[in-house]
């Protein structure tokens, strides 16, 4: 090996290592453009501190996070502005730091920075962060976020839980989102921990996750997906789920997990098999499916095993995850009374699509020029006064809310995973089930709304205890871009007093509004 080759190998190894060094709770996140080739195909991307996925942001329950986002973007085709959502955090009192562009803030302009400053008093678990401006996260601005609980009630179930036990899944495209089709027909590659192969790049490196025989690992599985859901499994190993979207759950043993865009699961893996190499599989629900040539795959490698690709084979799952089998570890009261519609406010979400745009109850979400939060702070007090017209729903304070999402062939691309900002919700009716569980359903923040073929009518409940405008949207980013969203303006009279905004937040809009369109 020449000196140049060894230097190159060192640089590549260093870059790979950077992705594993956690930052936080106080950190700079520098957003820029760079050429990357995570699956062996080189393209320009949006990177965080020079890597995609971005570095793990980590802290402890009770921490104050001060995350300074520095916008050094230069490539207009992937947008030069940005805005970052810290997915799964309630942001109580800091609605201005939630991140969705034109709902909670104006974007950060290139050449500027913005400090997201928020408290995490009572949440712990697995989260993530991503651009919430147009389809920018599909081009690379996404990464994992973990809040550790020093008093984790599941601590006795595992031996190892660290930077190296985070597993990210991402769909990767060889064409920038704005230069490709509005609705791609599948990703070119699935990246596991930032590495993968496409059918045309089957020599690319795969991620290797190392374990020591006899140890129990808490793996934190994070879907950074823009579109497909993935069926995740590890040959020869069961997975014991203990956390769902940052909610501790009763341990549930499964052998495969269908994980939808933006969902998270912690599972315990007992490294009790023969020393060797085992395939880790994440099969997308459409596009380049299967595992030929090592696509949609990574490697679980026991210490002492040869550094070779696995020869293990996949067995048909006998214990696939079924959402109705998930239950919170601690008792969590379901809002409302235990009957259909037994709430203060029940809203049905009727989906539609016209070939280019998605609609909810007849309205397609078009980002307003003035963020909804700013509209409210500026004096708008009624849903009918808030823009975009037809897409903002006023919710009273301290009320029990029920939302139903009947699956319909009128909204293609199902199953649509829906995410509610500012809350976790009880899933009282899950996809694939006709049963309503008001006793001990799982709480989470992203739910599959199922399929029309199954006759699904997924139903969730939450309580309005967090004043502010909160986005509810399909987390298939291409569908959100096509208007598949509404805003819940929660407790409008108290929004301004509950969420005092910093001057830097107020400065975002005039700076952004002065930009030429090519600099946005």
UniProtKB/Swiss-Prot annotation:
In the record's cofactor note, how is the cofactor described as bound? Binds 4 Cu cations per monomer.
Specify the signal sequence span.
1-21
| Documented EC number(s) | 1.10.3.2
SS bond partners: 106-509, 138-226
Any idea which positions bind Cu cation 1? 85, 419
Q: Which keywords has UniProt assigned to this entry?
A: Copper, Disulfide bond, Glycoprotein, Lignin degradation, Metal-binding, Oxidoreductase, Repeat, Secreted, Signal
Q: Which residues bind Cu cation 4?
A: 416, 474, 479
Instruction: List required co-factors.
Output: Cu cation
**Per the database record, which ranges form the Plastocyanin-like domain?**
23-148, 160-302, 369-491
Single Gene Ontology MF annotation: hydroquinone:oxygen oxidoreductase activity
Give the matching InterPro entries.
Cu-oxidase-like_N, Cu-oxidase_2nd, Cu-oxidase_C, Cu-oxidase_fam, Cu_oxidase_CS, Cupredoxin
Top EC class for this record: oxidoreductase
Binding of Cu cation 3 occurs at 132, 421, 473
Q: Name one Pfam family in it.
A: Cu-oxidase_2
Give GO terms for biological process. Answer: lignin catabolic process
Return the PROSITE patterns for the record: MULTICOPPER_OXIDASE1
Which reaction equation describes what this protein catalyses?
4 hydroquinone + O2 = 4 benzosemiquinone + 2 H2O
Binding residues annotated for Cu cation 2, in chain numbering: 87, 130, 475
GO annotations of cellular component type:
extracellular region
Please give the family membership noted in the entry: Belongs to the multicopper oxidase family.
* Role played: Lignin degradation and detoxification of lignin-derived products. Has activity towards guaiacol.
The protein in question is named Laccase
């Amino acid at each position: 090996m020449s000196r140049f080759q060894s230097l190159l190998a060192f640089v590549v190894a260093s870059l790979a290592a950077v992705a594993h060094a956690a930052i936080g709770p106080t950190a700079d996140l520098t957003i820029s453009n760079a050429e990357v080739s995570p699956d062996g195909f080189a393209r320009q991307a949006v990177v965080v501190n020079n890597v995609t996925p971005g570095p793990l942001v980590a802290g402890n329950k009770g921490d104050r996070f001060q995350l300074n986002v520095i916008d050094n973007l230069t490539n207009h085709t992937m947008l030069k502005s940005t805005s970052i959502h810290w997915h799964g955090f309630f942001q109580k009192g800091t609605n201005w730091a939630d991140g969705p562009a034109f709902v909670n803030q104006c974007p950060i302009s290139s050449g500027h920075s913005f400090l997201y400053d928020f408290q995490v008093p009572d949440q712990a678990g697995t989260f993530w962060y991503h651009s919430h401006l147009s389809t920018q996260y599909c081009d690379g601005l996404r990464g994992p976020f973990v809040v550790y609980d020093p008093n984790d009630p599941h601590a006795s179930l595992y031996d190892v839980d660290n930077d190296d036990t985070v597993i990210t899944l991402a769909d990767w495209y060889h064409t920038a989102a704005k230069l490709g089709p509005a609705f791609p027909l599948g990703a070119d590659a699935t990246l596991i921990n930032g590495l993968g192969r496409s059918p045309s790049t089957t020599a690319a490196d795969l991620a290797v996750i190392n374990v020591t025989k006899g140890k129990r690992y808490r793996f934190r599985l994070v879907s950074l997906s823009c579109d497909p859901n993935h069926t995740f499994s590890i040959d020869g190993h069961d997975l014991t789920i203990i956390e769902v979207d940052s909610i501790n759950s009763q341990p549930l043993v499964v052998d495969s997990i269908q994980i939808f865009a933006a969902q998270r699961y912690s599972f315990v893996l007992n490294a009790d098999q023969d020393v060797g190499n085992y395939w880790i599989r994440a099969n997308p629900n459409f596009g380049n499916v299967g595992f030929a040539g090592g696509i949609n795959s990574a490697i679980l490698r026991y210490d002492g095993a040869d550094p070779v690709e696995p020869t293990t084979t996949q067995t048909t799952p006998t214990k696939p995850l079924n959402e109705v089998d998930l239950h919170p570890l601690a008792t969590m009261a379901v809002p409302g009374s235990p009957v259909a519609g037994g709430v203060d406010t029940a809203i049905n979400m009727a989906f539609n699509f016209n070939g280019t745009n998605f609609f909810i109850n007849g309205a397609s979400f078009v980002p307003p020029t003035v963020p909804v939060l700013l509209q409210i702070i500026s004096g708008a007090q009624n849903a009918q006064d808030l823009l975009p017209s037809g897409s903002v729903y006023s919710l009273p304070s301290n009320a029990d809310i029920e939302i139903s999402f009947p699956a319909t062939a009128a909204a293609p691309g199902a199953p649509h995973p829906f995410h509610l900002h500012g809350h976790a919700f009880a899933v009282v009716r899950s996809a694939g089930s006709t049963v309503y569980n008001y006793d001990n359903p799982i709480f989470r923040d992203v739910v599959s709304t199922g399929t029309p073929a199954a006759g699904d009518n997924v139903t969730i409940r939450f309580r309005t205890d967090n004043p502010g405008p909160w986005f509810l949207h399909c987390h298939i980013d291409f569908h959100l871009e096509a208007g598949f969203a509404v805003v819940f303006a929660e407790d409008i009279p108290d929004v301004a007093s509950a969420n005092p905004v910093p001057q830097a937040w107020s400065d975002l809009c005039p700076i952004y509004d002065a930009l030429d369109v090519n600099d946005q």
